[in-house]
Structure formats: C-alpha cells, structure tokens
Amino acid sequence: TMHSAGEFKQAQERASEAENVPPVIPTPHHYLLSVYRHKIFFVAVIQSEVPPLFVIEFLHRVVDTFQDYFGVCSEVMIKDNVVVVYEVLEEMLDNGFPLATESNILKELIKPPTILRTVVNTITGSTNVGDQLPTGQLSVVPWRRTGVKYTNNEAYFDVIEEIDAIIDKSGSTITAEIQGVIDACVKLTGMPDLTLSFMNPRLLDDVSFHPCVRFKRWESERILSFIPPDGNFRLLSYHVSAQNLVAIPVYVKHNISFRDGSSLGRFEITVGPKQTMGKTIEGVTVSSQMPKGVLNMSLTPSQGTHIFDPVTKLLSWDVGKINPQKLPSLKGTMSLQAGASKPDENPTINLQFKIQQLAISGLKVNRLDMYGEKYKPFKGIKYMTKAGKFQVRT
C-alpha cells in the first residue's frame, strides 16, 4: 500500500546508509520486514506477528528466484519482466503463505522469459504460465521434476568460503570467522541418489541444508545423502567460528605516522601471503579511509594502480596478484593541513582478495557416490576462498 511505502521511505531517510535500515519496522497497523540486496529493498507487509526470520528467509528466496529466472536481479530487469514477476509471486505466495519456493517447480509452472517467448507472447497474447501441472509438486521429492534426461551427465560442486577478520596493529587476530557455502550444478538423468562425504566434517558448525538433504544421516554419520534438484542449487551453508580453525591467509606490514605540527606524514604498506598452502592470492584490492586532515597523498606502488580522492579521503589500491618473491608495496608521503593536530587514530585498511582451489577452513570433499542409476556421471569439485569484511588496524 502507499501508506506502507511512505512509512518505509521515512525509515530509509532516518538511516544514514541503506544497510542501516532496520530489518523489522513496527508501524501502527502492521510490520514491515525487508532485505537489501542488489541495491534494491524487498519489503514484506505483515498484518499480524510472525517469526521475522521466516519472512526474511522467504524474501531471500524471492530474490534468489528472480536471479535464477532473469540472470541478474536488478531494478531494470524487474520492470522489464513485471508480468513474469507477478506470475512467479502468485505461485510462491498463496493467500499470504509460502507455497512453491523451489526453482525447479516454479520453472515448470511459469516458464522463464526468453526473447523468442516474449515476442510470441506479445503477438499471440499468451503468457508464460505452463500448460500442465508440475510433476514434482505431487511427488515425494517436490524439488525434483520427473523424466529428467541428459546426454552428458555431470555433477559439479563449488565450495566457496568467505573470511571475515579484524587484525590489530601488531598483527594479532581480534576476531575471525568463515562463512561457507557449497553450491551445486547437477545435470543427471533420472532419479539419482547421491552421497557426499568430507575428510573433516567435524569442523563445520551451524550448518543449514537444502531440503533435499537427509538430516538424520548427517546427524549420525556426518555424510550428505540426497536426491538432488535438477540444475543449480545451494546444497548447504555453514559457519566456522572456532578461532583456532580460521587460518589468516594474508598479512599487511604498515608504517603510517603523523607528527604534531608537521604538514607531512609517512605512509608505507606491504601485503604478503601467510597460510595459503602454496596457492596464489589474486584479485587483491586495498582501500583505506584517511583522516579528514589529509589533503593529498604522493605514493608510489611497486605494482598495480592506486587513486586517492582528496574530497572523500578514500585511498584505493588495485594490487592484482601477490608474488611471494616480490611483495607488493605502496609507499610515500601525506600532505596534512598546516598546524592541525595529528589525527586521533590511524586509518583502518580494508582488504579484498581471492584464492582459487583453497577452502581456508581446510574443508575437503572425500568422495561423491551415486546410487539408483546405472550410468557413470562426470564429477568435479572446485574450492575458492575470498575476503568478506577483512580489516587491518594500523
């Protein structure tokens, strides 16, 4: 309703940044629950109290479904496909209750848009609504349609870990944790039954599974046993928060100094690999919000490109790959306001990076077996670690 939209707009204006809008906003007549993804707010209007996580999880599922349907989830894409968006939402929510949230089933009910289908619909006045009931909706495994056939049978799994860390100025870890996911792309004929086992499943805590995973089997044997959905899906997400299990893959050596009364400051940082099991760190970027008193910076990088914005005071350095034999460094001077006292605290350094073929937690897949079908599928597992919120204090 317009009224709810107005109340949400007010909450947006009160928050300094989009990320600071409260996920649950009580108003006189209802609750507004929202998630912020792809620079868009997705808002649910609730008339009576329900567990907020239930609604927030549903909103995330809506966003994932749009991404699956349209390739990207953006304001333009939603406007361009507004009819399909409404058709999908009609199936996902039935009279205010979540109904079909499984991408496989939705695609049988509402065909994803293609250029050809859009042209045909425009000419003939037809819609994307499927002409038959989905076979999976009525079966024991509602996430998988029946009669799936492929000429090439393959199952790929991506283990992706994101590391959040705060490192203090002496290089000690203040906090560190890993958020991990296993994303799957399974294209197998028939009704395959898969089991996936790990070398070291005990290091996973706080695990959440796709509904296809047999939970009892995980509880008793720490093995993932499941009949997979067809196509792309998230098999599980997990958390590793035990400090002793989180290896820190990079270090930053820094010498950033300001002197009282001096109009020059010193700035030196070097980035190097730490516990990377011999894997290359790539896609490295360094950014730092400099104090207000810094007017300009004169820096020389040993590699990559850097930029300092004298208005926003943001320093960005695009480093690229780290070569352990020749560590990347950025050195030089800072021009400060004349006569200004030195800043209260030194800037924080934010890092982004990627490491291919490494799960930083040490998680390793042991084997993948298939039952219930006779053919030999092609199997592949990839690992990747990337930085989430990774901060070094100086």
Model regions and ranges:
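Acidic, low-complexity cytosolic segments
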Residues: T1-N153, I160, I166-D168, S172, ...
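Intrinsically disordered, low-complexity Ser/Thr/Pro/Gly-rich interaction regions
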Residues: I110, V120-T394
